[in-house]
């Protein structure tokens, strides 16, 4: 009995051991399977996170682009609206065009004392004020010939006025729009002319610089006439030449036409960078480029100029001028196109009023870079003036 029992016990032990072994293997397999699934979940999560981040980044970028495009569209619509509104605004308010032509509110250089021309290197210049009309006062500079600069030190206005009766010729300079009589390029021209032995008298029109009054073509012309008469009353038989630059050429031809009509013409007229008339100049000006082909350009932009009483008709005035005429123009002038100066010459040269006087056109090559206001730099300018102002016989040349 003991022998039979022992095998049975051993068999049970083997079965238990086998069962235990089987159970451990299953547990191990189950544990391995759990770890594998966990690893797979972790791996899947790690791959999904970059994809989600990329999607979010793309959405943000698209949002920024959309916002930028909306802002850009808004800006474009505003610019377009302004572009369309400006012509109507100018048509309804012609005074805007007048301000853009005169630009008297632009005072360059800033922070200079016009009462002290010596601060601009003009140490032989006197500042004083004249009154062309009631409630109108204009500031004037009188620069004597450079050879007198030592004698001029400390002298008063009376000395300068008496000096006009000396044997030196006088140039009345009429500046263009914007700035004052103290503008840098203007001061440099005064110095050149003074070094050549001329008196230079210049002034700011009413509404410019420290001059009092409201700008207008009539007012500017009257101011110039008043200064001319003031000079003639003190200069005796000395030659008086009138020099106009840019917009000042319009004032100059207005003045000289009036002087010729009253039979008191100047000894010569010099026009630097002139135009034919203000309508053609406005149409050719760089500011008009963006509107030049705008429907109704003349009606919107040019007619308001005329309705404001602004013409500056050089092309008409030269037909009534009887004195020598010199025209100076740089080929690279970006403000008053060179062809307008040449066109003015072609109108003046055959005019009957000039049949007894010389008319000369002097171009300056674009390579020289004199542009609109630097002709004073030309080393040829002294010779040109000396030869032109020294001649008296009728002559047309260019």
From Swiss-Prot:
<dbReference type="GO" id="GO:0052651">
    <property type="term" value="P:monoacylglycerol catabolic process"/>
</dbReference>
<dbReference type="GO" id="GO:0046464">
    <property type="term" value="P:acylglycerol catabolic process"/>
</dbReference>
<dbReference type="GO" id="GO:0006660">
    <property type="term" value="P:phosphatidylserine catabolic process"/>
</dbReference>
<feature type="topological domain" description="Cytoplasmic">
    <location>
        <begin position="1"/>
        <end position="74"/>
    </location>
</feature>
<feature type="glycosylation site" description="N-linked (GlcNAc...) asparagine">
    <location>
        <position position="123"/>
    </location>
</feature>
<dbReference type="InterPro" id="IPR029058">
    <property type="entry name" value="AB_hydrolase_fold"/>
</dbReference>
<keyword id="KW-1133">Transmembrane helix</keyword>
<feature type="active site" description="Nucleophile">
    <location>
        <position position="246"/>
    </location>
</feature>
<keyword id="KW-0443">Lipid metabolism</keyword>
<protein>
    <recommendedName>
        <fullName>Lysophosphatidylserine lipase ABHD12</fullName>
        <ecNumber>3.1.-.-</ecNumber>
        <ecNumber>3.1.1.23</ecNumber>
    </recommendedName>
</protein>
<feature type="topological domain" description="Extracellular">
    <location>
        <begin position="96"/>
        <end position="398"/>
    </location>
</feature>
<dbReference type="GO" id="GO:0047372">
    <property type="term" value="F:monoacylglycerol lipase activity"/>
</dbReference>
<dbReference type="GO" id="GO:0004622">
    <property type="term" value="F:lysophospholipase activity"/>
</dbReference>
<feature type="active site" description="Charge relay system">
    <location>
        <position position="333"/>
    </location>
</feature>
<keyword id="KW-0378">Hydrolase</keyword>
<dbReference type="InterPro" id="IPR000073">
    <property type="entry name" value="AB_hydrolase_1"/>
</dbReference>
<dbReference type="GO" id="GO:0004620">
    <property type="term" value="F:phospholipase activity"/>
</dbReference>
<keyword id="KW-0325">Glycoprotein</keyword>
<keyword id="KW-0256">Endoplasmic reticulum</keyword>
<dbReference type="GO" id="GO:0009395">
    <property type="term" value="P:phospholipid catabolic process"/>
</dbReference>
<feature type="transmembrane region" description="Helical">
    <location>
        <begin position="75"/>
        <end position="95"/>
    </location>
</feature>
<keyword id="KW-0472">Membrane</keyword>
<comment type="function">
    <text>Lysophosphatidylserine (LPS) lipase that mediates the hydrolysis of lysophosphatidylserine, a class of signaling lipids that regulates immunological and neurological processes. Represents a major lysophosphatidylserine lipase in the brain, thereby playing a key role in the central nervous system. Also able to hydrolyze oxidized phosphatidylserine; oxidized phosphatidylserine is produced in response to severe inflammatory stress and constitutes a proapoptotic 'eat me' signal.</text>
</comment>
<dbReference type="GO" id="GO:0016020">
    <property type="term" value="C:membrane"/>
</dbReference>
<keyword id="KW-0812">Transmembrane</keyword>
<dbReference type="GO" id="GO:0005789">
    <property type="term" value="C:endoplasmic reticulum membrane"/>
</dbReference>
<comment type="similarity">
    <text>Belongs to the serine esterase family.</text>
</comment>
<feature type="active site" description="Charge relay system">
    <location>
        <position position="372"/>
    </location>
</feature>
<dbReference type="Pfam" id="PF00561">
    <property type="entry name" value="Abhydrolase_1"/>
</dbReference>
């Amino acid at each position: 009995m003991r022998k039979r029992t022992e095998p049975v016990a051993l068999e049970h032990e083997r079965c238990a051991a086998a069962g235990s072994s089987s159970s451990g293997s299953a547990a191990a397999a189950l544990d391995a399977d759990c770890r594998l699934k966990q690893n797979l979940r972790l791996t899947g999560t790690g791959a999904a996170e970059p994809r989600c981040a990329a999607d979010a980044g793309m959405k943000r970028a698209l949002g920024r682009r959309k916002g930028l495009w909306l802002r850009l569209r808004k800006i474009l619509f505003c610019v377009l609206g302004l572009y369309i509104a400006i012509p109507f605004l100018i048509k309804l308010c012609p005074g805007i065009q007048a301000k853009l032509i005169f630009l008297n509110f632009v005072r360059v250089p800033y922070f200079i004392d016009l009462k002290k021309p010596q601060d601009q290197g003009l140490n032989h210049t006197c500042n004083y004020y004249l009154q062309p009309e009631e409630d109108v006062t204009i500031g004037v500079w009188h620069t004597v010939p450079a050879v007198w600069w030592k004698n001029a030190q400390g002298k008063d206005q009376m000395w300068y006025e008496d000096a006009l009766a000396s044997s030196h010729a006088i140039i009345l300079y009429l500046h263009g729009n914007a700035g004052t009589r103290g503008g840098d390029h203007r001061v440099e021209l005064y110095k050149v002319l003074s070094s050549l032995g001329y008196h230079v008298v210049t002034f700011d029109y009413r509404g410019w610089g420290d001059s009092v009054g409201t700008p207008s073509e009539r007012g500017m012309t009257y101011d110039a006439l008043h200064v001319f008469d003031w000079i003639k009353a003190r200069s005796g038989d000395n030659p008086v030449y009138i020099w106009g630059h840019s917009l000042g050429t319009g004032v100059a031809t207005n003045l000289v036409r009036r002087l010729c009509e009253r039979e008191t013409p100047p000894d010569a007229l010099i026009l630097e960078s002139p135009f034919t008339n203000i309508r053609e100049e406005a149409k050719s000006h760089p500011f008009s480029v963006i509107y030049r082909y705008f429907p109704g350009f003349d009606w919107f932009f040019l007619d308001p100029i005329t309705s404001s009483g602004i013409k500056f008709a050089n092309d008409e005035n030269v037909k009534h001028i009887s004195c020598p005429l010199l025209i100076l123009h740089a080929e690279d002038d970006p403000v008053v196109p060179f062809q307008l100066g040449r066109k003015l010459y072609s109108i003046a040269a055959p005019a009957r009023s000039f049949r007894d006087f010389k008319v000369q056109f002097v171009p300056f090559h674009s390579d020289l870079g004199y542009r609109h206001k630097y002709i004073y730099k030309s080393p040829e300018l002294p010779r040109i003036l000396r030869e032109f102002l020294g001649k008296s016989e009728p002559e047309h040349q260019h």
